[in-house]
Amino acid sequence: MKKGAMQKSKQWNVKGAVRLASVFHFLHSCGSGCLLPFLTLYFRHLGLSAAMIGIIMASKHLLALLWRPFSSVLARQYDKRRTVIVGSLLSSALVVLPLLLFPSAGILVESGRCNTSQPDADPTLPLAVIEQMTVPVGSNATVYSVNQTSVSTNQTLEDNTLVNHSRSARGLRSLKKEEEPHSEFLGSLKVMDAQHQMFFLVLLVTALWEFVAVPLEWTADDGLYEYLDFVDATDRHSGVKVWKHVGAAFGSCLVGVLVTNLFCRIGNSVEFYSYTVLMILTVPASALLPIYLRKRERPTSGGFKALQLVHGNPQAILCAVTVILTGMVTSAVSDFLLWLMQDCGAMEIHMGICLALAHLSHTGFSPIAGPLSRFLKYHGWMLVLAVVGLAMQCLYYSFLWSPWAVMPAQLLAGFSTGALWWSVTSQSEDIATPGTEKTILRLFEAFSLDMGAALGSLIAGFVVQKFGVNVLFQGASVMLAVWSSALAVLKWKIPRQRRINYSRLLAADTEVSESESDQEKDWLETAMEDDRRNNKWTVNKS
């Protein structure tokens, strides 16, 4: 019996579980930081326009919005969480590599870095004519597209016609039904110019990559949360998020240094290879990741319940609108800030350090969040400050004059993001019923990181295509400034409704009772002793 108890206590090792989860999220975030922030730069290198890149990124976010919660539910229902995590790591590491096979359809500002001409660097395009495209005002970059000659297209069609006529009539009839959809697909590709062909292929690969990569985060997070919840240690779960930001900062800085030093040898492929290597290195950590499956099933209407709670609270509705708007602006910044830095002469090392600074400043917000919240006396005012900070950040970006000048704005970006999610977390706790806190917080995350990000990427792509990056950031700053003023007035006018959370009250009462000295007695024991003394005094008197 004693041996079984020892095995059980060894099995539920909370500190070890948190350490393993921290290592896992550090490696995974490090790999993501090596590639995701630089993805739009690589698409620009391929010759895609800003509008095309906006459509690709918007499709990526929309796919995540739909597939992430559904895949998380399926992994839990069939008890395949670890399989999903390992499969997602390996698949995403391999699926992203075909993007390196696409030849560059453009000559960008970095073409003069290695003292070699760009046409010589792309010998795979002998039948192409490089035509310069008009760049919107406000951008210093020159983008080129590649259009195939009509001679090569007509020659290909003639060759296909000869081959088709050489087949027998019976063979044509049998192949017509089988290859008609395939022929229509290839025919539509042949009609497109080289730039649209590139856009269509990149969109397919990116969608497939997102499909295999997106189930990992929620699946791993759910397994750890339920593991800690089983042993009443969910307060340790928030400590894991810090390592996500540290890993992303390390990955961005590392790949910036590597690309800057190895660009003339292997070009932009360093980012992809770094991502693949780190995803594979994360697999052993995922095999040891603590995952627990509850025997009882959760209610399937958790998402609808969270929507009802948000819809029924005016303050929560304001918070939802705010996270959608901030998600739009944050997505636009993440997609096109590096474009602006590249136009100012920045190299990847500048970009990596600036991205790392934003992540580290986000982690540095936690120590001051408590005192700042007590000073403001209401977390809703911190939400207003976050919107104001993001507006100032975008305005600063629009007047960027050198690569290193972005660093003050990156410091402000980390604090603005930290203040935003601190306020959102507090708002989720205010309206949550027991067991719905995490679901409501994820609903706000989906509003911001998926829905808002999709709208922001789509709109930002067309704005940059038409007016330039500077106008994009100025417009985002004006929009956030107007909303921050309206938000402050509405926060002041709308009464605050806070639901009583009995689980938090019980936890607070437990902490208070544990901090009391042993000499102090429970109120029930004191009342019983007083009653006994009163009864004894009455008996003696009689």
UniProtKB/Swiss-Prot annotation:
InterPro entries: MFS_assoc_dom, MFS_MFSD6, MFS_trans_sf. It comes from the Eukaryota. GO terms for cellular component: membrane. Keywords: Membrane, Transmembrane, Transmembrane helix. CDD domains: MFS_MFSD6L. It is found in: Membrane. It holds the Pfam family MFS_1_like. Signal peptide: none annotated. It is a multi-pass membrane protein. SUPFAM superfamilies: MFS general substrate transporter. The chain crosses the membrane at residues 46-66, 89-109, 198-218, 246-266, 272-292, 321-341, 352-372, 381-401, 404-424, 444-464, 469-489. Belongs to the major facilitator superfamily. MFSD6 family. This is Major facilitator superfamily domain-containing protein 6-like. It comes from Danio rerio (Zebrafish).
